[in-house]
């Protein structure tokens, strides 16, 4: 009887907290962490066991090491989804098979389809890494909400890298741009222009910082299960 009463009490507390969060959502005052809490409470009330599957969202410019890290996470069991590879599959080479000025227009439906695939994978219990840069705070918030709606846990990883390092990598990659979906050709002027548009995450966007070691980053991601949502992989 005591166990039943305890369960009933816990359910009542969860329902009350869920009501508070939903009122905050209607008032447009709900934080990103609040959205995650809604997802977790809803999962608990529905009887789904275990922690929420994670979706790794990366933020960084070209040449920062996103694909290297994403492939390491894929080897560790995450499902890797890459918009650039899907763009190459659908449309061919950027600047040869379609004009450079059409990239964003063509990318929009690709990102929409990948967002849907992310939700489907999370709903099935799979963990996901999105091999993409997510340059702006607004874009990151939208994708985090997409993850939360599917019952997943968004984990943001920031990949800072000096311009000189990125440009050296891009120069080497440019030679493969006609055959490699992950080697889109960019000039140094492109990189400098894009850097001015990039919004690095601040302390109010919980994130991990990648320092170039995939193994250390995987360990840091595992520690997010214990509630450490900010930090540097070391």
Predicted regions and their residues:
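N-terminal pre-Walker A segment at the start of P-loop NTPase domains
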Residues: 22-47
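Glycine-rich phosphate-binding loop used to anchor ATP phosphates in small-molecule kinases
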Residues: 30, 105-154
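The conserved Walker
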Residues: 61-62
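Conserved substrate/cofactor phosphate-moiety recognition/catalytic segment
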Residues: 68-126
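Conserved phosphate-donor/acceptor-positioning beta-strand/loop module used by diverse small-molecule
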Residues: 150-170
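Small-molecule kinase domains that catalyze NTP-dependent phosphoryl transfer to phosphate-bearing small molecules
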Residues: 176-227
């Amino acid at each position: 009887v005591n166990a039943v009463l305890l369960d009933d009490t816990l359910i009542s507390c969860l329902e009350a907290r869920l009501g508070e969060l939903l009122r905050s959502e209607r008032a447009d005052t709900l934080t990103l962490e609040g959205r995650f809490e809604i997802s977790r409470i809803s999962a608990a009330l529905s009887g789904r066991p275990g922690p929420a599957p994670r979706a790794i969202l990366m933020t960084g410019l070209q040449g920062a090491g996103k694909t290297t890290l994403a492939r390491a996470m894929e080897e560790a069991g995450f499902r890797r989804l890459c918009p650039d590879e899907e763009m190459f599959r659908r449309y061919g080479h950027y600047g040869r098979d379609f004009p450079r000025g059409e990239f964003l227009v063509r990318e929009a439906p690709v990102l929409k389809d990948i967002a849907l695939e992310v939700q489907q994978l999370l709903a099935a219990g799979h963990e996901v890494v999105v091999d993409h840069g997510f340059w702006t705070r607004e874009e990151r918030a939208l994708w985090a909400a997409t993850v939360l709606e599917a019952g997943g846990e968004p984990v943001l990883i920031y990949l800072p890298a000096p311009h000189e390092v990125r440009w050296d990598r891009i120069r080497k990659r440019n030679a493969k741009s006609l055959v490699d979906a992950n080697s889109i050709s960019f000039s140094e002027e492109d990189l400098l222009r894009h850097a001015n548009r990039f919004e690095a995450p601040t302390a109010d966007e919980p994130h991990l910082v990648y320092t170039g070691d995939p193994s250390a980053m995987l360990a840091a991601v595992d520690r997010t299960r214990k509630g450490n949502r900010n930090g540097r992989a070391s």
